[in-house]
């Protein structure tokens, strides 16, 4: 069947409204436990969450379903999504589960799964679980009473992740003398990220580290990088770091308070790895949303940019298929496959800090090498998600814009995989032209797809 539950980043929605309900989480736990149970041995599942109030409810429901299916559950509490991926591998678990809605506000939540290797589940496995969950007559294969699973709290999980994340930073380098502003979005990394940076010697100025269950992503974190930028200028810090609620994405601010997106950071890291001969095939993997300037930059430096559909899962899939070690998204998902199987904001931050330390230059000088093309992105709420080619006014508008831009720009329309939104993106050489065309296309989409 189709992807009726899972979007590009798992299951997501408003709490206590279908599908993000406790009974759905219970059935998902049963389905996951049934799908991944194999043989008579004990099976293990790692469950982590961010700081949303509803996380406790979903943690309990998922645990009940998984235990009923015969899985032992290891609850690690609030930790970043990449930490759950790591712990799933580290603890030799059969499955990892993350309860988070990433950058969304507290009233939303989500559930996503990792396989035993720490990778997000492929579509066909999610569809198998969907079939089980949505079939009211599904016959669950419950284990015998003595084989029901148990639940455990893993108190040292944050420490394990810190040791792992620090292992990606050269042993002969420290962050002594660096002043770092970090905004943890009142989310999953509110404890771990500042502590890891402090252990490496940085002076850390903390924002968004007082979660109360309701303030995750509220005017803070990667969606509000201007907050970090202001604090960097105020404190004369060397760098600013803005994470999202589950800490798998990163937006960076240089010492001047200039906000850098994922494309600029990917260019910096790609050039560093190519110079060291550590980027296989000189290949960088990014999505269709990445700026044209990144593609030009890679060509000028003897590399190639491979584009994928939007979603870090698709970036990772392409990286595995082509043997690439660096990939990411403009939105700040950065994947260093030598160390991790998914986007990791703290890991990415340490790689940037390493480059700053090794080169002895300020971030503004290092990252200023990529001059982005003017790009306008507009999110339009839509009621229908029909193929754009089937809506003639929209198709005509796209064709007209492509004709006007020629080979010096591009237009992209895509539906969000997690929201009722159409993303309208226009890119070109002239900012006034780009803004005008993007507004025109957004109005057409709003008029005909409402």
UniProtKB/Swiss-Prot annotation:
The keyword Ubl conjugation does not apply. CDD domains: GlmM. It catalyses: alpha-D-glucosamine 1-phosphate = D-glucosamine 6-phosphate. Keywords: Isomerase, Magnesium, Metal-binding, Phosphoprotein. The keyword Signal does not apply. InterPro entries: A-D-PHexomutase_a/b/a-I, A-D-PHexomutase_a/b/a-I/II/III, A-D-PHexomutase_a/b/a-II, A-D-PHexomutase_a/b/a-III, A-D-PHexomutase_C, A-D-PHexomutase_C_sf, A-D-PHexomutase_CS, Alpha-D-phosphohexomutase_SF. Its EC number is 5.4.2.10. HAMAP family: GlmM_B. Belongs to the phosphohexose mutase family. This is Phosphoglucosamine mutase.
């Amino acid at each position: 069947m189709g992807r009726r539950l899972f979007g590009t980043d798992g299951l997501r929605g408003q709490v206590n409204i279908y599908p993000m309900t406790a009974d759905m989480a219970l059935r998902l736990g049963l389905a996951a436990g049934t799908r991944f149970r194999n043989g008579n041995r004990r099976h293990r599942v790692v469950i982590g969450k961010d700081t949303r109030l509803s996380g406790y409810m979903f943690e309990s429901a998922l645990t009940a379903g998984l235990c009923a299916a015969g899985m032992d559950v290891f609850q690690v509490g609030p930790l970043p999504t990449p930490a759950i991926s790591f712990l799933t591998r580290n603890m030799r678990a059969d499955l990892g589960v993350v309860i988070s809605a990433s950058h969304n506000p507290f009233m939303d939540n989500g559930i996503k799964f990792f396989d035993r290797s720490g990778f997000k589940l492929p579509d066909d496995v999610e569809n198998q679980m969907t079939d089980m969950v949505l079939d009211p007559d599904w016959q669950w294969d419950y284990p015998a009473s003595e084989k029901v699973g148990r639940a455990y709290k893993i108190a040292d999980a944050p420490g394990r992740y810190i040791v792992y994340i620090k292992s990606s930073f050269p042993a002969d380098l420290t962050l002594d003398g660096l002043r770092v502003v970090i905004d943890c979005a009142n989310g999953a990394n509110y404890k771990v990220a500042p502590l890891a940076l402090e252990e490496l010697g940085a002076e850390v100025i903390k924002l968004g580290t007082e979660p109360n269950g309701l303030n995750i992503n509220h005017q803070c974190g990667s969606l509000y990088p201007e907050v970090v930028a202001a604090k960097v200028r105020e404190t004369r810090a060397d760098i600013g770091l803005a994470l999202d609620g589950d800490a798998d994405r990163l937006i960076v601010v240089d010492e001047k308070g200039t906000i850098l997106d994922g494309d600029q950071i990917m260019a910096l890291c790609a050039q560093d790895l190519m110079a060291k001969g550590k980027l296989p095939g000189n290949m960088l993997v990014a999505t269709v949303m990445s700026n044209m300037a990144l593609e030009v930059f890679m060509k000028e430096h003897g590399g190639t940019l491979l584009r994928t559909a939007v979603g870090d899962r698709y970036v990772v899939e392409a990286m595995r298929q082509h043997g690439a070690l660096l990939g990411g998204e403009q939105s700040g998902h950065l994947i260093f496959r030598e160390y991790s199987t998914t986007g990791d904001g703290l890991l990415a931050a340490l790689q940037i800090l390493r480059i700053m330390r090794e080169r002895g230059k300020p971030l503004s000088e290092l990252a200023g090498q990529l001059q982005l093309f003017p790009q306008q992105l507009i999110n339009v709420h839509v009621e229908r998600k029909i193929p754009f080619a089937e809506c003639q006014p929209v198709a005509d508008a796209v064709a007209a814009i492509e004709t006007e831009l020629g080979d010096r720009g591009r237009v992209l329309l895509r539906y969000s995989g997690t929201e009722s939104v159409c993303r309208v993106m226009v890119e070109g050489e002239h900012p006034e032209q780009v803004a005008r065309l993007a507004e025109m296309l957004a109005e057409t989409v709003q008029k005909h797809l409402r």
